[in-house]
Amino acid sequence: MVAARVLALVVDQGRSLKTELAAALPTLEDVRDRALVEAICFAVLRRRPVYEAALTQWLARPLGRGDAQLRGLLMVGFAQLDVLKVPPYAALSATVDACRVLGWPHRASFVNAVLRRAQRERLPVVSSDAAWPRWLAERIRADWGELAEAIFDASLKPAPMWLRVNLRYGDRHTYVQRLQAAGLEAVPSGLVPEALALDCSMPVLQLPGFQAGEVSVQDLSAQQVAALLSPAPHARVLDACAAPGGKAAHLLERAPTLCLTALDVDMQRLRRVAETCDRIHVKARLCVADATDLAAWWDGEAFDAVLLDAPCSATGVVRRQPDVLLHRRAEDLLPLLNIQSRLLDACWRTLRPGGVLVYVTCSVLRAENQTQLEAFLARTVDACAEDPGDAYGQPAGLGRQRLPGEQGGDGFFYARLIKEI
């Protein structure tokens, strides 16, 4: 029932899945129920075109606009049978009971009949890009050719839960042993010394040492950013779009003496940076401002290193944010390109000669990545790009691109820029 309501808000009212889950899950007392609702919502959004095709084929009359919650409930039932492999009797019973709780006893037999058909028959087969808006799928194909299918396929699969071990409290091997003592298994990454991939997802607060700051949750691709920036101890560092704070926290875990300014335009999101810093026991200067408005926040003292994790289309993290494909519009792209360009220009002004600026996005669109970088270099005479290296993915112009799922990480673009002296 909770999952059906969340899905109706996300699919039919354009709400954020992350926001709606954050509001809905605390209403459930049992952590197992919370995990099930979250798993159902992600499964439905990843498999929504399949379930829509099934309803189109199986229903004599299509569901109307007023049936959003009923459609969501049917998809909840499909997901339990199709992805989560809940025993059929349990999936049918729970979904039919939800009809009665929602005040639809007259629809219980209808829901039961549809789910029994799903149990008997195969669900329709749809193309791997069926969930992607046509304009976006066409752009992915134009950018990536034969690799487009791999992007679409990877975006349908659940993302692994990556952990970042805080090496100030102990080494990675010791933390793996703690996980094993708790009945959990994890695989170390060869790319980042702090990174571990859990064999299954779990509630963050149940991770050993999480609340004490001994471990954090952060995707592998995001964890690689700290080494690419690699500021010296005591350096002045700017994280220009800092929220929710994972990259700033990682930098400070590695070098607690950094003088790091965490900047974000959103006060609520910046509070999350503060909470993260408090949890891992590091200090940062927090500033609420638009990074492009230098007069509003910058004191004129240059930074040694700047991290610009720019707002983007999020096309590299669809496996973690499947509702991106519901909400992203073609007209969103140009404003994003404009703000990325303005952020690059503004942040560059704050960087000292000889300093390093790292530009990253969680996008796989060339317009936001190598094309954006090439345009910046063309208009910025004192900027030069250094190749991040093979550990950061395949060459993408003067940067590097990891596609979703490669080496277990999210889709990410990386560029390392040096300000000439």
Swiss-Prot record:
A GO molecular-function descriptor: RNA binding
Reaction(s) this enzyme catalyzes, per UniProt: cytidine(967) in 16S rRNA + S-adenosyl-L-methionine = 5-methylcytidine(967) in 16S rRNA + S-adenosyl-L-homocysteine + H(+)
EC code: 2.1.1.176
Entry keyword Metal-binding: no
Location of the protein in the cell: Cytoplasm
CDD domains referenced in this protein's UniProt entry, alphabetically: AdoMet_MTases
InterPro entries: MeTrfase_RsmB-F_NOP2_cat (IPR049560), MeTrfase_RsmB-F_NOP2_dom (IPR001678), NusB-like_sf (IPR035926), NusB_RsmB_TIM44 (IPR006027), RCMT (IPR023267), rRNA_ssu_MeTfrase_B (IPR004573), RsmB-like_ferredoxin (IPR054728), RsmB/NOL1/NOP2-like_CS (IPR018314)
Pfam families reported in the protein's UniProt record: Methyltr_RsmB-F, NusB, RsmF-B_ferredox
Binding-site positions, S-adenosyl-L-methionine: 241-247, 264, 290, 309
A single Gene Ontology CC term: cytosol
Catalytic residues (positions): 362
Main subcellular location of this protein, as a coarse class: cytoplasm
Alphabetical keyword list: Cytoplasm, Methyltransferase, Ribosome biogenesis, RNA-binding, rRNA processing, S-adenosyl-L-methionine, Transferase
Any one GO biological process: regulation of DNA-templated transcription
Family statement: Belongs to the class I-like SAM-binding methyltransferase superfamily. RsmB/NOP family.
NCBIfam families, per database record: PRK10901.1 (NF008149), rsmB (TIGR00563)
Alphabetized PANTHER family for the sequence: NOL1_NOP2_SUN FAMILY PROTEIN _ ANTITERMINATION NUSB DOMAIN-CONTAINING PROTEIN (PTHR22807:SF61), NOP2 YEAST -RELATED NOL1/NOP2/FMU SUN DOMAIN-CONTAINING (PTHR22807)
Function, in words: Specifically methylates the cytosine at position 967 (m5C967) of 16S rRNA.
Protein's name in the database: Ribosomal RNA small subunit methyltransferase B
Organism: Xylella fastidiosa (strain 9a5c)
The organism's taxonomic lineage, starting at the top: Bacteria, Pseudomonadati, Pseudomonadota, Gammaproteobacteria, Lysobacterales
